[in-house]
């Protein structure tokens, strides 16, 4: 066989192999050094990606004309498919998409990657089947349709609708790729799944935070705009802002992000309007220092650090996370007190993560606790109560609180795969 015929045969074999490994409208190119590029046109709503939970994470960059649109870590199936997850293509319809994929560093050569089952099971589709397949899905408590969920975030009430955002991984039922998932309800029992609201960017993934209804347009984003302030978790943890003018369905990130910078591990912003000072207050935690930090602002964009609380108070065993601050009436006295909520992991009364609280006075700058430092008050003594925070703008002056019904001791080990 001459060289020309051999070359032609090799090209034919490569073509047949490529067709066997993907839909004909998806091109898979194996480039060596654990690098694979997948090319397709976004002419359907989703790219369905096969996931194997025990597989190492592959780093995926979504490119259009060479520009990175989104980045995520995905456990692409190697030996078997556990389930499918959707990459939402609706914002990129008609565009030529390139997925630049780097598989795990310990893969020895490109032939390992070529044999992975994910390539032949990727598919473009206009539908994603999210009907429940789990025997143990709660009927009463909120769960995501698919993927991972932990802390409730950014919750607000407006126009008869309760909006719940939450820490969400759209690409597996394990922790990672932190995004704000979104559900809505008119009764806090029956939930409608909405599209994910805020994805990660160059500053990092989207950790916990809060939202407020800016009724008086203090931010300049419009009267009644929804303003979300959250932690950008990249190489460091900084605080960022996004706003919505369609009642929280979509958000635009503020061009001046980050709005608060720190050299500490600071996160989980909670913003409230303080009627006594006519200012916004923001509380967040310096997680490893066991401190709650207090800030004030007139416009939600520019913040002044006012004070701190926490050294030596309450449970100090684990990291502090997800604070909240609210003023409540003291029953039968006509008096009001401030309640500062701080979640802790580990260090709960029955192990793992839990929610503690402090009662005292707050003047917009400093919190003074009524109890002695060694006194710890627990909101719940059970094991399934963490990241408890309240809705903003609740009707009738209520303070409505929701917690994550799980525990970091076993959250990754519950007997489900479609969601956790």
Regions found by a protein language model. Give the residues of each.
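Bacterial Sec-dependent N-terminal signal peptides
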Residues: 1-24
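Beta-rich carbohydrate-recognition and catalytic domains
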Residues: 24-269, 273-321, 327-381, 396, ...
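Glycine-rich, charged/polar anion/phosphate-binding loops
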Residues: 385-387
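Anionic-ligand-binding alpha/beta catalytic cores of soluble enzymes and soluble regulatory domains
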Residues: 390
């Amino acid at each position: 066989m001459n060289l020309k015929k051999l070359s032609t045969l090799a090209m034919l074999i490569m073509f047949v192999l490529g067709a066997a490994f993907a839909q004909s409208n998806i091109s898979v190119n194996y480039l060596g050094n654990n690098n694979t590029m997948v090319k397709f046109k976004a002419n359907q709503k989703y790219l369905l990606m096969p996931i194997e939970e025990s597989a190492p994470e592959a780093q995926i960059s979504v490119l259009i004309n060479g520009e990175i649109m989104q980045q995520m870590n995905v456990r692409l199936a190697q030996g078997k498919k556990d389930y499918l997850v959707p990459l939402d293509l609706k914002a990129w319809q008609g565009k030529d998409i390139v997925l630049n994929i780097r598989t795990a560093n310990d893969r020895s050569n490109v032939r390992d990657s070529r044999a992975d089952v994910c390539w032949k099971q990727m598919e473009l589709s206009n539908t994603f089947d999210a009907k429940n397949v789990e025997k143990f899905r709660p009927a009463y408590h909120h769960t995501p349709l698919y993927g991972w969920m932990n802390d409730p975030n950014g919750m607000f009430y407006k126009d008869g609708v309760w909006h719940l955002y939450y820490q969400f991984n759209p690409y597996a039922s394990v922790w990672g790729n932190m995004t704000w998932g979104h559900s809505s309800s008119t009764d806090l029992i029956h939930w409608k799944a909405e599209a994910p609201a805020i994805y990660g960017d160059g500053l990092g993934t989207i950790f916990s935070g809060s939202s407020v209804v800016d009724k008086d347009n203090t931010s300049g984003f419009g009267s009644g705009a929804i303003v979300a302030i959250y932690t950008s978790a990249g190489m460091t943890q900084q605080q960022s802002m996004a706003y919505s003018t369609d009642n929280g369905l979509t958000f635009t990130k503020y061009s001046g992000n980050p709005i608060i910078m720190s050299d500490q591990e600071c996160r989980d912003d909670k913003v409230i309007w303080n009627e006594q000072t006519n200012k916004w207050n923001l509380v967040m935690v310096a997680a490893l220092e066991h401190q709650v930090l207090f800030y004030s602002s007139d416009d939600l964009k520019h913040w002044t650090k006012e004070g701190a609380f926490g050294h030596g108070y309450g449970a100090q065993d684990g990291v502090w996370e997800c604070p909240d601050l609210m003023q409540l009436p003291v029953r039968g006295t006509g008096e009001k007190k401030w309640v500062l909520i701080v979640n802790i992991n580990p260090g709960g009364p029955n192990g793992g993560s839990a929610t503690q609280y402090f009662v005292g006075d707050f003047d917009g700058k400093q919190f003074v606790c009524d109890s002695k430092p060694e006194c710890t008050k627990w909101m719940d003594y059970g094991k399934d109560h963490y990241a408890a925070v309240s809705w903003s703008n609740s009707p009738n002056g209520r303070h409505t609180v929701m917690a994550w019904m799980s525990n970091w001791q076993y959250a990754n080990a519950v007997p489900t795969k479609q969601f956790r």
